[in-house]
Each structure stands twice: as C-alpha cells, then as structure tokens.
Design a protein with these regions (language model features):
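Long, hydrophobic/aromatic-enriched structural stretches that serve as scaffold segments
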Residues: 127-136, 173-176
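N-terminal Sec-pathway targeting helices
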Residues: 1-16
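Long, charge-dense tracts
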Residues: 81, 91-131, 162
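Primarily the internal scaffold of c-type cytochrome electron-transfer domains
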Residues: 25-99, 143-166, 172, 177-291, ...
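Hydrophobic alpha-helical membrane-insertion segments, chiefly the h-region
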Residues: 13-26
Length: 344
C-alpha cells in the first residue's frame, strides 16, 4: 500500500469512527430528558410558573399552546371564535334542546382551559364534575380530601378556589414530586380496571397514551353521585360503547338529553380520542398520542419532549417522518383529502 493510500485509509477510518459515534449518540439517546429533577415547593406545585426556571424547554414549548394559528389543512385549529355551529349548521338542529346548540366552538390550546371554560355559555347549571380534567386541583385537593364529593357541587363553588395559574399545567400530567407521568383520574382507572388493565402498573410507553387518555375519551356522569365513568366494559369501538348504554350498564344514566322536537333520548359522543386511537393502526404499531402530538425535539444539544400539544402537521419532521417514508407534502395531501371528503 502506497503512502497516499495509507493516508486516505486513515482519514476514512477516522471519519467512520466519528460518524458512527454521532449516529449512536442520536439513535441511542434515552427517551427521557437529561434535565435534573427540581424540587418544587409544595404550595406552588399546582401552578405552572414554579416550573418555568427548572424546566425551561418544556415550559416554553407548553406556552406555545397560546398559538391560535389555523390548522395546516384549514380544518380545526385553535382560532378563537371558530364555531362548529357555523361551520356545520346542521348541528344546531341535531343538538336542539341541548346546551351544545347554544355554543360549540373549536378547541383552543390547553393554556386556555380555564378561561374558555369560565366563559362558555354552557356553564350555568353545571356541576363540579365538569372540571374534573381542567385542573389537578380537583384531584390533589378535592379528591384526596373527600373523594367524589366535589362532583355534585355547583360549578361556581367547585371552581371558586382555583387560581388562574392552577388550571391545566405541569401537575395535570406529572407527579410534582418525581415528575413521572401520572394517571390519577379515578373514573378512568376504575373503567380500565373493569377491562382487566391496571393503568398504573403499565409500561412507560403505555402511560404515554394513558396520561392523555384519562381525559380525552367518551365519558358520562353517574346518576347516583355525579362521578365520572366511561363505557369501556364491552370494548372501545363505537358499537360496543353504544351497547353499553343500551344494556343498562351505565348505572342509571340513560341519555345526554331529550331532543326538543323528536323527544327521542340522545347520546353525544364527547371526545373519544382514546378510543379512536386504541382501535387504530398507530396503536397497533405502539405509537402513542405523545409520539405524534408532543414529539421529541432538540435545542442546543438538549433533547426534550415538546409540550406544544398540536397538530402533527405543524411538526411533521419530528412527528411523522421518523416513521413514514413519504414526503411531508404527500402526508399533508393525504390528511387534506380526508378533511375535504369529511367537510365539503
């Protein structure tokens, strides 16, 4: 081997080792972040501001939920004042006699959970169970003290002590002492247990779904005490849940409302996101809510989980292209077609 060949071989060997190291660093990076666990004062744990300095990347990305830009496809999104009743006027007739015929707006980001709830025209006459998922105050204070008693309180009384900073925040999904994901919505825990699933003994990957699923699901309020329950017993597809209601398994609950014109008992699917996911190809592949809606990001060499809970088409590189080999344009076109076929 000539001297030049030896030099070239040496350069190639160094490059192989260097790039191999880079690839290993990227691929083998742990799923959790390397952020050190911070001690949050107990009297500040239900708020958000106390976590700001300890977890700046997560906090700053969470505040991006204030974004009200439209969806990349033009359907849905978080724009203030966008009404389903305007976009789909047939809903006014479909929901006649029900409060959703009065106001039914597009969801805004989680940072608006408190203000949008307090300002909805559907609020009068509701009970405390309506804010079970809006703040961890409901669990960490009310439920720990007196179980489901809060569920039957007038809504004004139940939400009165909740400070502005204590609506949906870090402790809604994380144990404030350990920052581990926590599944604590008792109605969800009980409903999954009836299916033989102990959600708090689940794998970390499953918890990345359950932490969202405990609130993003179909639910109803038990007639006896107002507690939250879920129609999961017979299965998670729409037909199984409908059969649950029809068979009298719902503990005295029979309908969401009586239609004003037809007088027929009616059911309204709330937001069965968990069930839609659980019966999907993504769930079969082990892909969770977090993988698509809160993907891993990197900033200044730090890997972290984005807490901007948003449309995956706004983070296509991180959310979709880690698995899909199609282009971003192809994936968007596919979603666009589904939206067009649904709403046009």
């Amino acid at each position: 081997m000539s001297k030049l060949q030896k030099i070239l071989a040496g350069i190639i060997a160094v490059c192989v080792v260097f790039f191999g190291f880079v690839v290993v660093r990227i691929v083998a990076a742990p799923n959790d972040t390397s952020v050190k666990l911070a001690k949050i004062p107990q009297d500040k744990q239900l708020g958000k501001e106390a976590y700001k300095d300890a977890y700046p990347l997560e906090y700053n990305s969470f505040m991006k939920n204030n974004d009200t830009s439209p969806s990349p496809t033009g359907y849905g999104g978080a724009q203030e004042g966008n009404s389903h009743l305007t976009e789909q006027p047939e809903m006014v007739e479909n929901f006649k006699g029900y409060k959703f015929a009065i106001q039914y707006d597009d969801d805004r980001g989680h940072t608006y959970a408190g203000v949008d709830f307090k300002n909805t025209k559907r609020l009068p006459g509701q009970k405390g169970n309506c804010i079970t998922c809006k703040s961890s105050y409901m669990y960490d204070v009310y439920y720990k003290q007196s179980g489901w008693d809060y569920a039957s309180k007038p809504i004004e009384e139940a939400m009165g002590p909740i400070e502005d900073d204590q609506w949906f925040g870090c402790s809604t999904c994380h144990d404030p002492e350990t920052m581990e994901l926590r599944v604590y919505q008792q109605g969800f825990i009980d409903s999954m247990a009836r299916r033989g699933i102990d959600v708090n003994n689940a794998s970390h990957n499953d918890k990345r779904a359950y932490v969202c699923a405990q609130c993003h699901n179909e639910y109803y309020f038990m007639k006896e005490d107002g507690r939250v329950n879920h129609p999961f017993d017979n299965g998670l597809d729409a037909e199984s849940e409908y059969q649950f209601y029809q068979s009298g398994q719902a503990g005295g609950f029979t309908q969401d409302w009586i239609h004003a014109d037809s007088k027929a008992p009616m059911l309204k699917a709330q937001h069965p996101d968990f069930e839609t996911w659980a019966t999907s190809v993504h769930a079969d592949a082990g892909v969770t809510c977090v993988d698509c809606h809160m993907p891993y990001m990197r900033e200044n060499g730090q890997k972290y989980t984005s807490h901007w809970m948003t449309n995956p088409l706004k983070t296509t590189e991180e959310s979709c292209l880690k698995c899909h080999d199609e282009s971003a344009e192809t994936l968007k076109a596919r979603v666009q077609t589904i939206g067009d076929n649904t709403f046009k």
